[in-house]
Amino acid sequence: MKKIGIIGGTTPESTCYYYQNYIKISREKFGPFTFPELIIYSINFEEFKNNPRGWEGRTEILINAARALERAGAEIISLSANTPHIVFPEIQKAVSVPMVSIIDALIEEMRRRGVKRVLLLGTKTTMTADFYKNALREAGFDVVTPVEEEMDEIDRIIFSELAFENFEHKPYLIDLIERYAREEGIEGVILGCTELPLAIKPGDVSVEVFDTAAIHMRKLIELAAE
């Protein structure tokens, strides 16, 4: 099997969730003791999140991590968070091994489940930037995003609570999803930040839940097994 490389640390909690899915999905697919080889390069999230050079500095950090994984023998590489995919093309150009996009894996799964209209939740960057919404719309999906004040609150919950495994405002997130189901006719919700699945589970809401971290890891394991 191919060796998987993951750029982690964005945040450490979501990287742990990736690893939990790696164990669960590998056992479902291969049995109790067979796992693709996996290398995790965990970056310093403080240097990433509050980089004084903004996305130029963040991109440099991610490229250095991807190159380190390539040198370590990774044959496929991924980012373990949604927001850094804003610079996915730049990172892919910097390495010679293929990278696996969380957005491409998500689109494939959304088509498989047959949904059309979805609510996108994530960091404020993910919800407002074009890179995510445009990819989904070009693939034929209707994408709904929260209003500005809701985006601010979701972003706060992600970085101030979920990043520390604090689920105090889980009811707020559930109520928001259900309201958009009633008022906007959404058929599914994209948990477009890999911290969100730590709080929101498929049985919590009445619409399809797209856990991007689990979907991404499943795709990585499928590709590793080819």
Region spans (language model):
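Non-catalytic structural scaffold of enzyme domains
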Residues: 1-226
